[in-house]
Amino acid sequence: MNGRDIRICTIFAFAKMEFMEKLHPIMFAGTGSDVGKSIIAAAFCRIFKQDGYQPAPFKAQNMALNSFATPEGLEIGRAQAVQAEAAGVPCHTDMNPLLLKPQSDHTSQVVLNGRPIGNRNAYDYFRKEGRDELRREVCAAYDRLAARYNPVVLEGAGSISEINLRDTDLVNLPMALHAGADVILVGDIDRGGVFASVYGSLMLLRPHERERIKGILINKFRGDIRLFESGITMLEELCGIPVVGVVPYYRDIYIEEEDSVALAAKSVRAEKGKVNIAVILLRHLSNFTDFNVLERDPRVHLFYTNNVDELAKADVILLPGSKSTLDDLYELRRNGVAAAIIRAHREGATVMGICGGYQIMGQEVLDPEHVEGDIERLPGLGLLPISTRMSGEKVTRQVKFGLCNPHSPLMQGYEIHMGVTTPVEGTPDSPLNLLENGSTDGYYVDSTCMGTYIHGILDNPEFIDFLLAPFADKLSGNAGAFDYHTFKEEQYDRLAEHVRRHVNLPLIYQILTKNHD
C-alpha cells in the first residue's frame, strides 16, 4: 500500500467513524507475562473491525527482538504490527512509540517513535531521571492515535502489579489512567494459581487504580467449562468485578507470536520424507517470524537447532537475524556450529542468511566504532565474498523487489539493520535481489549459497519456490506453496470467532459505552 492509498483509506475511515458510537478505549492488562494479552488484543482488534468500528492497537512500551518496519520506514514491535493487521489498518509508530530491543542480559537499544536513540542498561532506564520525557512522548503518541481511531485497543506489559516499578511505569495503569481506558485483567489458568494471581494483582493496586479494572478474563482454559462455573462466582464475589469470559486453550489457530518463549515449542529435529530446513538457534536471534510461513508449507519440515548432528541432516540451513551479530558469530565458532554449517554446505546443503545471518556468512564482520560491543573484528563463515562494517545508522524501510533475473515477479519485505555490506576487493558484485528503486540487495553465489537483508522474504511464495527448486525430486507429489496473506486473514477471523464464543461481548460493549463520570 503506497502513501496515496493509505491517505484514501484514512479519509474513508474518518468518515465511517462519524456514524459509529464512540467506545471507551480498552486495555488488556495481565497478571504476568505470557498470559496471552497480545493475542487477546489482536482478537478484539478483529472483532471491533468486524462489528464496523475502526480500531487500532497501542502498547506504550514493548520489549522484543521481533520488530517490523512501518510504511514510513520506522520501527515498531512485531506484536503491534500483527494487531494492526488484524484491525485492517496500516501500522504506525504511534501504536508502539517505545521499543526496547535487548542486546544483552542488562542492555537494550531504545527505539523512540521508530528511531533508535541509544543503548541503556536496565538500571539507568528504570530510574526516574528522563522518565517524564518518555511519558510525555508515549502519551502524545496515544493522543494522536485516539484522535484517528475508535476504539484504541491498549495492551499492558508483564504484570499489572509490579509495585517496585510503580513510579516509573509507562505502560500499564498510568497509561490506562491517561487514556481513560476500561481495563480487562487477563489471567492464565493453564499455569495454575489463577485465583491467587487475579486476586493478588487486584489487591496490590491502589484504590483509584483498582477502579479502572472493569472485567476479568480467564485465558487458556482446558477441560469442561462447567467445572469452572463455581470458580467464576467465587472470583466475582472476591473481587467485586465481573468475569467477562473464559477463553479455552486452542491449538488449531495460528497467530504470529512475538516472544522468543514461543521457540521452545518448535521442532528441533529433522524429519524423513520432506525437505528439511534448519534454522540456526542464535543466542540473540531476532525476527524469528521470518520463518513462520515455512511451518505451514506442506513440502518442508522446519526445525530449530544448534545440534551439529541434526545440521548434517538438513537440506537447507537458514541463518537468521541477530541483535548482536558479532557475539553470535563468536559463539557459533566456539560451539562448533560454524564448522558444521561449512561442512554441511560442502556436502550439498543450501545455506542462506537473512540480515545478521547474511553478515555472518561473509569473510569478516568489522565493528571499529563499537556499535555492538567490544569485539572489533571477527572472521565470518567465508561462504560469501562480502565484508560488513557495523554502523550506528539504522536502515529501516519496507521494500519491493524481485530476483536479479528478467522474469522475476515483484515481491515485498522490509529491512531493519545496522551495518554496510560490500563485496571484498577484487570480487564482482552479484546481488540476489533488485529493489524497485533500482538499488540492489544481498549476494548470490549459486542456488546453494546466498544472503539478503530483507526480512519477510520467505513470506513470498515465489521466493520459496526459488529456494526449493534444487529439491524437485523430494517435492514430487507434495502440494505447492500457499498464499500466506490469505492464510493469516483466515486465522484472524478464526481467532475472533473463538474469542466471541467464549466472552460476554454484550457486557463488554456495555462497559465500553457506560458513562463512568
Predicted regions and their residues:
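An internal, acidic/charged active-site-proximal segment
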Residues: 176, 338-345, 350, 366-382
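A conserved active-site-flanking secondary-structure segment within enzyme catalytic domains
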Residues: 362-418
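Catalytic nucleophile serine of serine hydrolases
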Residues: 355
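Flexible phosphate-sensing "switch/lid" loops adjacent to ATP/NTP-binding sites
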Residues: 11, 18-343, 350, 392-393, ...
